[in-house]
Amino acid sequence: MITSCQIRAARALINWSARELAEKSKVGVATVRRMELANGIPSSNAQTLDLIIKTLEKAGIEFIGTPDDKPGVRLK
């Protein structure tokens, strides 16, 4: 699992807009924005969250930590 802050930070690292992430993940822009506004772990279905994670990892993002212990992101 990842947090909403990790999604925002990952987008910032690779300089993607919410629209770009949505298009590349094949989800709606509203879905990305809703996930990023959540507190902690986004409350979306697991499949949608998995699409976001895989898209960001394919773009070179590595998710580190856990939602409860120093969550972060870095470039691979």
Mark where each language-model region is.
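A detector for short, charged/polar N-terminal pre-domain segments
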Residues: 1-2
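Helix-turn-helix/homeodomain-like alpha-helical modules used for DNA recognition
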Residues: 61-76
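Accessory recognition modules or surfaces
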Residues: 17, 22, 28, 72-76
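Residues in the recognition helix of alpha-helical DNA-binding motifs
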Residues: 10, 24, 35
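Short basic helix-loop element that most often maps to the first helix and adjoining turn
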Residues: 7-20
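Recognition helix of helix-turn-helix/homeodomain-like DNA-binding domains
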Residues: 27-44
